[in-house]
C-alpha cells in the first residue's frame, strides 16, 4: 500500500514498515513523524512524537488527538516541513488521528473527512470505538453529527468506498482555504503563547533571563547581543537546568526550546538590547 499523501506536500499517512523505505521517506522530504505504534526506523533522522496506543475500541484517544493536532500544526508552521502519521498498518489508529486533524483543522463534517480520506487511502478502517469518539468530537466542534453512532453509519460508507472508485477530483474541498489557514495560524500562536507563559513561571522567570543577559554582556564586553546567540544561551540553560522542563514540553504537545524562546522574546516586556 505504501505511503499516502493526504494534504499536498505536507501530511502523509502510512504504516510503521514504511519508515524502513529510506529512499521513499527522503523523496517525500519527511521531517516529522507522529507514531501511534512506537516503531520508527532510523529515528535519528526525524523529529518524532511517539504516542503509542492500542488499536482497541475501549481506548480513549482524546489526549492523542489533542497532542497530534498541535504537533501537526507546529510542523505546518515550519517552512518546508512535512509530517508522516503512522501506526502498524496505516488503517485504524493513524487514520483516526488524521481524521481528527482534518476535522479540527477546518471544521469540515466527519462524513466529508472520511470520504476524503478514503479517496486518498482506500483501505483505512478506524475501529468503531475510535469512530464513536470522532463523532463526539464533531458534535463538540459543529453541534451536529453527520454519521450515526447507533447504526455505525461509517461502515456503510467504508463498504461503498471499497466497491466504488472514488473520484479524487470531487474531494478538493478538504484542502485548507486561505482564510482557514490564517485563522489556524492565529490559534497556533495563541496556543504557544499560553503554554510559554506557564513555562516561564515554572522554569525560566524574568529575573533569571535578565541575569543571563547581563552575564553575556559582560563576557562579550558589549551592550548589544545577537538574538540567535542569546537564544542558544537560553536553550543551553534550559537543557542543563532540569529534566522537568523537558518533560513539560513533551506533555504540552511536543514544543521545543525554540518555540518557547521565540515566544519569550516576542511577547515579554523585557528591555533587552537584541539585534
Swiss-Prot record:
Lineage top rank: taxon: Eukaryota
Chemical reaction(s) catalysed: O-phospho-L-tyrosyl-[protein] + H2O = L-tyrosyl-[protein] + phosphate; O-phospho-L-seryl-[protein] + H2O = L-seryl-[protein] + phosphate; O-phospho-L-threonyl-[protein] + H2O = L-threonyl-[protein] + phosphate
Enzyme class label: hydrolase
GO biological process: negative regulation of MAPK cascade; signal transduction
Gene3D superfamilies per the UniProt record, alphabetical: Protein tyrosine phosphatase superfamily
Cross-referenced InterPro entries: Dual-sp_phosphatase_cat-dom (IPR000340), Prot-tyrosine_phosphatase-like (IPR029021), Tyr_Pase_AS (IPR016130), Tyr_Pase_dom (IPR000387), TYR_PHOSPHATASE_DUAL_dom (IPR020422)
Residues of the active site: 87 (phosphocysteine intermediate)
GO molecular function: phosphoprotein phosphatase activity; protein serine/threonine phosphatase activity; protein tyrosine phosphatase activity
Matching Pfam families: DSPc
Database matches in SUPFAM superfamilies: (Phosphotyrosine protein) phosphatases II
EC number in record: 3.1.3.16, 3.1.3.48
Domain Tyrosine-protein phosphatase as annotated: residue spans: 2-143
Entry keyword set: Hydrolase, Protein phosphatase
GO CC annotation terms, alphabetical: cytoplasm
Family, per entry: Belongs to the protein-tyrosine phosphatase family. Non-receptor class dual specificity subfamily.
Function (record text): Has a dual specificity toward Ser/Thr and Tyr-containing proteins.
Descriptive protein name: Probable dual specificity protein phosphatase DDB_G0271350
Organism: Dictyostelium discoideum (Social amoeba)
Amino acid at each position: 500500500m505504501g505511503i499516502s499523501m493526504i494534504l499536498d506536500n505536507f501530511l502523509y499517512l502510512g504504516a510503521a514498515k514504511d519508515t524502513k523505505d529510506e529512499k521513499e521517506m527522503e523523496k517525500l522530504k519527511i521531517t516529522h513523524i507522529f507514531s501511534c505504534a512506537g516503531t520508527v526506523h532510523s529515528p535519528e533522522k526525524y523529529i518524532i512524537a511517539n504516542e503509542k496506543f492500542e488499536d482497541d475500541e475501549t481506548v480513549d484517544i482524546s489526549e492523542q488527538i489533542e497532542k497530534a493536532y498541535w504537533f501537526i500544526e507546529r510542523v505546518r508552521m515550519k517552512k518546508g516541513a512535512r509530517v508522516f502519521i503512522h501506526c502498524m498498518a496505516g488503517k485504524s489508529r493513524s487514520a483516526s488521528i488524521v481524521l481528527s486533524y482534518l476535522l479540527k483543522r477546518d471544521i469540515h463534517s466527519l462524513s466529508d473527512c472520511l470520504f476524503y480520506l478514503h479517496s486518498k487511502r482506500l483501505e483505512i478502517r478506524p475501529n468503531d470505538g475510535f469512530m464513536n469518539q470522532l463523532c463526539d468530537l464533531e458534535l463538540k466542534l459543529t453541534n451536529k453529527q453527520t454519521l450515526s453512532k447507533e447504526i455505525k453509519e461509517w461502515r456503510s460508507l467504508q463498504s461503498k468506498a471499497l466497491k466504488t472508485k472514488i473520484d479524487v477530483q470531487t474531494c478538493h474541498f478538504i484542502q485548507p482555504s486561505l482564510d482557514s489557514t490564517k485563522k489556524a495560524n492565529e490559534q497556533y500562536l495563541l496556543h504557544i503563547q499560553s503554554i510559554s507563559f506557564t513555562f516561564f513561571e515554572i522554569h525560566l522567570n524574568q529575573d533569571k533571563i535578565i541575569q543571563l543577559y547581563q552575564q553575556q554582556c559582560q563576557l562579550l564586553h558589549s551592550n548589544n547581543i545577537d538574538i540567535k546567540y542569546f537564544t542558544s544561551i537560553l536553550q543551553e540553560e534550559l537543557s542543563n537546568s532540569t529534566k522537568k522542563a523537558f518533560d513539560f514540553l513533551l506533555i504540552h504537545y511536543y514544543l521545543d526550546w525554540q518555540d518557547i524562546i521565540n515566544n519569550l522574546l516576542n511577547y515579554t516586556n523585557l528591555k533587552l538590547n537584541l539585534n
